[in-house]
């Protein structure tokens, strides 16, 4: 009996430190923080081992009547032990994946913000004044280029159109009528029209030339000559401009020389002046010209022709001819006879008359101006 009493006493004396150890473990578990990255499988095993040891101790102490206060704690630990163990490696991977996704989404957001700012800047640049001005200039240049291209194409098509117009068959095709005619009849009709047009042109030319022969003024001849050129089919205004410029240049060069005819007692003489004379007043037949000019040659019935190697001027009023183109005596006699019938005043003149002279001298215009 003594041995059994000692055993009970030793059990009762060892009861308090066991309870103190359980309280300390409960306090530590309550104060401990839940950290995923510090928990491992070893800590889980140690905690399970401690819980089992405490459960064994509590089971031993449950036999005593004073151990009923710790039943709630023991039931909770039992439930924790029965629960399946959680894989903390998967938890770490999920946490790392969320961190990576957040960083990548932040990077995409920054990139989109930069692109948006660039788009806003580009819009501001395109809506600026300089860009609009440059665009307007470029549009004008493109329009000018299109106009030039259209003109070049029209110029290229012009020769083909002219060839088509010259071809009588194509003309007949364009002006085709529904009347029953053969090709020969159409061609003969076209030929008759062309011949009639040629005859009309010849008649106009003949009338103009006849009028120019009867007209004594050189301005009338210039007008008729211009009309002849203008009525011709190959007339072009650019050619008239070129001839006018050439005539003006030649007249400026040849205006340094001028012919003056002086009459004194039915004796005529021709002078050559270095410069064109001024507008002289009408002089009577008895006045002397010795103070103005020196006579070099006199003739009672003919004038001495002036030799020039310059070209003939048809619009300036001065007609000049080279020495080899002067008329012979027989030609002058014929012209004198025709001049008597053309003009009664030509009997008193010593030179050839202008109305029938093919190569009129340069002093005719001066005579007509003085008369």
Swiss-Prot record:
Primary role: May be involved in cooperative interactions with calmodulins or calmodulin-like proteins. Recruits calmodulin proteins to microtubules, thus being a potential scaffold in cellular signaling and trafficking. May associate with nucleic acids and regulate gene expression at the transcriptional or post-transcriptional level.
Domain IQ: 93-121, 122-144
Keyword Nucleus tagged: yes
Stretches for region Disordered: 1-32, 285-308, 327-371
Record-stated family: Belongs to the IQD family.
UniProt feature, compositional bias: Basic and acidic residues: 17-29
Region (Calmodulin-binding): 125-141
CC annotations in GO: nuclear envelope; phragmoplast; preprophase band
Subunit: Binds to multiple calmodulin (CaM) in the presence of Ca(2+) and CaM-like proteins.
Source organism phylogeny: Eukaryota, Viridiplantae, Streptophyta, Embryophyta, Tracheophyta
InterPro entries: IQ_motif_EF-hand-BS, P-loop_NTPase
Protein name as annotated: Protein IQ-DOMAIN 7
Subcellular location: Nucleus; Nucleus envelope; Cytoplasm, Cytoskeleton
Segments of skewed composition (Polar residues): 297-308, 327-341
GO biological process: one example: cytokinesis, division site positioning
Keyword presence, 4Fe-4S: no
Pfam (any one): IQ
């Amino acid at each position: 009996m003594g041995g059994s009493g000692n055993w009970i006493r030793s059990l009762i004396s060892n009861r308090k430190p066991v309870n103190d150890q359980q309280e300390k473990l409960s306090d530590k578990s309550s104060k401990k923080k839940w950290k995923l990255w510090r928990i491992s499988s070893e800590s889980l095993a140690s905690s399970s081992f401690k819980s089992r040891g405490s459960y064994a101790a509590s089971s031993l102490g449950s036999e005593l009547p004073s151990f009923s206060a710790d039943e709630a704690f023991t039931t909770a630990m039992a439930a924790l032990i029965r629960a399946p163990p959680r894989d903390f490696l998967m938890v770490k991977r999920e946490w790392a994946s969320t961190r990576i996704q957040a960083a990548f989404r932040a990077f995409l957001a920054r990139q989109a913000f930069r692109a948006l700012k660039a788009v806003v800047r580009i819009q501001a640049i395109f809506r600026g004044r300089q860009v609009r001005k440059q665009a307007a200039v470029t549009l004008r240049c493109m329009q000018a280029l299109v106009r030039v291209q259209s003109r070049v194409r029209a110029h290229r098509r012009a020769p083909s159109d002219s060839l088509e117009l010259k071809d009588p068959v194509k003309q007949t095709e364009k002006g085709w009528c529904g009347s029953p005619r053969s090709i020969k009849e159409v061609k003969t009709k076209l030929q008759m029209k062309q011949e009639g047009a040629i005859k009309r042109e010849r008649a106009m030319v003949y009338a103009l030339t006849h009028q120019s022969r009867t007209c004594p003024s050189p301005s009338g001849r210039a007008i008729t000559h211009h009309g002849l050129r203008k009525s011709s089919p190959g007339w072009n205004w650019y050619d008239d401009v070129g001839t006018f410029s050439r005539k003006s240049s030649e007249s400026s060069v040849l205006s340094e020389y001028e012919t003056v005819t002086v009459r004194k007692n039915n004796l005529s003489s021709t002078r050559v002046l270095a410069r064109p004379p001024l507008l002289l007043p009408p002089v009577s037949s008895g006045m002397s010209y010795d103070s103005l000019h020196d006579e070099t040659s006199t003739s009672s019935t003919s004038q001495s022709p002036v030799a020039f190697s310059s070209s003939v001027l048809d619009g300036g009023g001065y007609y000049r001819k080279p020495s080899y183109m002067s008329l012979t005596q027989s030609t002058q006699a014929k012209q004198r006879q025709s001049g008597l019938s053309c003009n009664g005043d030509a009997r008193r003149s010593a030179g050839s008359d202008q109305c029938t002279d093919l190569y009129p001298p340069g002093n005719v215009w001066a005579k007509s101006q003085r008369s």
